């Protein structure tokens, strides 16, 4: 399965009409029972156990209600999403469809967003609607996503198109724009790999895999690399079966080149201890467990704790210069301590220039740093920088003295002592290096 970084789809399943009254059901327009006509004498004649015929409303009534509701009520996107979510949780799938149709009928040009058409497509499916309507809803979703240029919307709609097997050309456009806007995220690249697999496009596959493997992925690097290799091999096999052997061999050759890494560093040890790597990169950034990836392409993809006694740093596409490796001690059990560690350093891994070096690092109170110099690095540009939240220092509020104690009228600042001072508000601490 391909990991996804968007919300999950609405629950699917047949609509269920509860037998008991549902207190959470939305208001509905119910027709009145037909009035009984009184005879000329002014009396109403009845028959014992007479059943009064009342025509029951059908599903069309809920559509009429929400159409009328949104004709006179304006609602924010957040409120609509909350309403749709609650209806879906309560398995009121026809109401989900009716709400979205009513809203989009009146606000499609002014308030509509891509997710609304995605939800509409799912609602049509849940209510066993026709495939043509689902396709149309996703077409509108794609148009909205493309107009928004929001990478989350682009990825979400592209994922829906691939899931349904619709309009691969449009899905490709959405994926390509998203991957350019967020090159540090894996989901657009994984979707591009899936699209290449479905369309048997070796060029797209090679480009997506190369971009994916040009970075380290903290917490899942080996799984992502394994997935990419598997997808390439399966596409190459399919190409061979279609008589496209030359394209298959070219694709496999590209994979070998993409899997190579400029810098690979691994630290291992024996004993009850935990150690992390901190690598100072040539242009000034530091990769460590707290900030695992830098804008220069390096990443701490694994930190050893407990029985997993291994920490790994990779920089598949690196800038030239000195890489200073420091070992941070997280803990070291005095009863079963780790006394030394093995540091494995590989440059130009998987190429004819590959160089391996192994060092034994004594794990004393002070651990000397190790410097590795790289030449021939393949990185040409930095990744986009996303600033972390700004730390704010708020001074501790002190209780102001009373007027009697001070002997004078309190100043406005003393009267509002709980408000942070202008010096404290917005104070920015230096980023650790």
Q: Which role fits each region the language model picked out?
A:
Residues 201-264, 283-286:
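Long amphipathic alpha-helical scaffold segments
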Residues 74-75, 108-111, 145-149, 182-183, ...:
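Short coil turns that delineate tetratricopeptide repeat
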Residues 240-417, 424-433:
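Intrinsic-disorder/low-complexity signal
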Residues 87, 107, 123-125, 161-162, ...:
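Residue at a conserved register position within TPR or TPR-like alpha-solenoid repeats
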Residues 1-73, 391-433:
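Compositionally biased, proline/threonine/alanine/serine-rich low-complexity intrinsically disordered stretches
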Residues 45-61, 65-110, 115, 119-129, ...:
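Alpha-helical segment of the N-proximal tetratricopeptide repeat
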Residues 62-66, 95-104, 131-144, 168-179, ...:
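Alpha-helical repeat scaffolds
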Residues 81-82, 114-119, 151-157, 186-192, ...:
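Alpha-solenoid helical repeat scaffolds
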